[in-house]
Amino acid sequence: MTVGCVSTVTRYYLPDANNPRFDTDRAAQMLDQYLRVQCPERLAAKKSESGESRLTITTDTSGAVTRAELVSSTGDEMLDGMFGAVAAQLEVDSLRATARPTATRQLRVGFSCAPDAAVATLQVLP
């Protein structure tokens, strides 16, 4: 007889009331600043120059994210953590829950590192 075990780790992020809320443009700017510090180290260590993660975000009736859950990783725990933390601080009017107290959407966060540039992208998926 063979017995197997499967375990799953769910990583989610909650907003911090002590930190500001961001729209998607401001969130991308914040991540760009972070990547400008991280990218030279990534490139020197021969780590991936680009990638993306996907998160499921839950918003309230104001469009503020109340929870961001990592569903697809970049493969880098530090980047995933930063993307999750910033996603949890989003507040976007077009993401307001209207029919119920909360709404759930998918968010794609990408990054690209080059010797002289670092870019983050955020896209709320339909």
What residues fall within each predicted segment?
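Long, charged low-complexity terminal regions
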Residues: 42-44
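Short loop/turn segments at connectors of secondary-structure elements within structured domains
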Residues: 49, 64-66, 79
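Short helix-terminating capping/connector loops at secondary-structure junctions
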Residues: 48, 99-102
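A short acidic/small-residue loop/turn micro-motif
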Residues: 72-78
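Short, small/polar residue-rich loop motifs at catalytic or cofactor-binding pockets
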Residues: 47-54
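C-terminal motif of bacterial Sec signal peptides marking the signal peptidase cleavage site
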Residues: 2-4
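Conserved "boundary/linchpin" sites in short secondary-structure elements
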Residues: 6-40, 60-72, 84-94, 101-126
